[in-house]
Structure formats: C-alpha cells, structure tokens
C-alpha cells in the first residue's frame, strides 16, 4: 500500500486535535473514514491470497519495484497493461522480445539507481530505500532473507505489498502452464484496476492459440529440443535444456513434444554431450537470454549434431520472452507451429 493515507483519514485525524470526543472515537472515526475513502475508488479494495500471504490493496500501486529473477514476465505484464509509469525500479531485461518495441520499452524504464547484489538483484537496504508500495518477484527467492533480500514481512512494515508470480511459491516452476501467464495478467489487472484490459489480452491469446492448435490437430508431433543459448546452469556440457514447465505446454499447443521431457524431474536437465547426441531431435528451439544472436547458437548446434533430423532439415527457431511466463505465449505457439508444420500455414 502507498504510504500516503487517504485524504478522508488525514482529515479525521486533524479534527481529533480540536474535539474532545476523539479519545474514545478515533478508532471508529478513522475506520469509517477509511471505508468511505475506499468506497470512493471503484474497484477497491482488492484482496489477493499469494503464497499464503494476504495482500489487500485500497488503491493502485504507484511505486512498483520489479525484481530480476532471470525473468521478464512481470515487467512485460505491466507494460502490456499500460502500467510502465507505475514502475520506479525494474531489474528485468532479456534484451530482446518477439513483441515489437517491448525490449526498448523495458530498457527505458528506471532501474532505481541501486547497486545490485551477487544475485544481480536488489538487496534489502536498497529495496527499503526505494520506498516501494509493491514489489514483484517471479519466485519466493526474491524475498528470502538468507539471500540478502528484504522479506515480505519487512516490506509490509514499510508499507509495501509483495507478490510472487504463479507457481513461484516453492521456487519450482516445473508445473507451470500457459494458464499461469493468464493468472499473472488477471492478478495485475485486479491490483491496478485494469481487469478489462487483462481479459481482452487473455481472450486474444486464447483465440490465437486455439486457432493454431486446430490447424495442427492430427499432425505428427515432432520431438523438439528447447534450451537457452550460451547459458550454463550445471556441470555438464548441456545444462540449460528444458525438461518441464510452461515450455512443454507451448510445445503441445504448437503440435510438438519435448524430446527431453523425461530427462529431469525439475524444469531443466543437465546432460552430457553423449546423452544429447543419442537423442533424436526433430526440431530445435533456442531461447535467447541477453544473447544478441541466439540463431547463430542454434546453427552451431545443428552443425555439432549432424545426425539429428533437425540438422538434416535445418529446422530451428530462435525465441525469447514469448517462451516464458508472460503475456505473449501465443506468439511462441504460432512461431513453433509454423516451424514444425509449415505445410499447414
């Protein structure tokens, strides 16, 4: 919540200084005044249950801090809802996007001028100094004190609401689906009184995805390798291969399957070159994360594994934010379907 109190509440407090009845009636009067002020704002109050924490909003936040979390879901959702002016500090950026102008819009947002910690995110003291009224984190990691971050309770004490994105409560995003992108849009739509806009975005995405899925229905489902370009997450040669999560839902809607879905119980697989070479890969999806040329990385992989059907047919696509939690999953579904089933488009 904003640290600014409603005008009606402030006025009630001022009146208490000059009346003799305030000693007994301050609580009642203040509550009534706050209820009156809240009633004057259509769409509020809004209450969200988020990872076991109840968050109540009596007005739209105006000092939002978006934590990094190796995500662009939260900042992209805010921009899709036309809320860029509410952001006082954003740490998210992929440096590219399937949505024209989005990468530039993200770059233009303020970063708060803070010095980031070793996790490339906003440390506790700097966060408090930003005076946020809402802090967004893609997982609960961003509110873990042992990681050097301000906790949700500490932020509540300084008047800030907090929000962990869908499936991020336990830091396990392996069950994430496209529906979670819609949940994020809906939640932010409610918080900022932009529900109508959120529902329009969701309806358009659902329509696009349904149209693509209808076209590829009944087609053979190629086996697809999805991985991040030039990124190391483990000790093996290929540690950023996608195994589970929203990526698989996108592949399914596009008429494909994940070639490495069984390689790990978590979101990512950490595999040797030999294991990768022994797997049939019909198509390749490379996700660019601050990589200026993920397509070059894709071509390099195809040369490295010429036995793949993907290499023989030069079947690949380079994507970025549309493959992750966020408002643009329909773009990834479309582009992957066009790659996998060119004869149907």
Where would I find each of the regions flagged by the language model?
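Bacterial Sec-exported substrate-binding components of ABC uptake systems
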Residues: 2-77, 190-228, 280, 288, ...
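Short helix-initiation/N-cap motifs at beta->coil->alpha
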Residues: 50-52, 114-123, 264-273
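Short, solvent-exposed loop/turn elements at domain surfaces
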Residues: 55-57, 72-78, 96-99, 233-237, ...
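A short, structured surface patch at a secondary-structure boundary
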Residues: 66-130, 134, 139-143
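Extracytoplasmic ligand-binding site segments that recognize negatively charged/polar headgroups
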Residues: 95-98, 141-150, 163-187, 219-246, ...
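Short helices/loops that flank or line small-molecule/ion binding pockets
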Residues: 123-134, 149, 270-280
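Structured C-terminal subdomain patch of bacterial secreted/periplasmic proteins
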Residues: 175-184, 263, 275-279, 283-345
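Alpha-helical, coiled-coil/dimerization segments enriched in small aliphatic residues
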Residues: 237-268
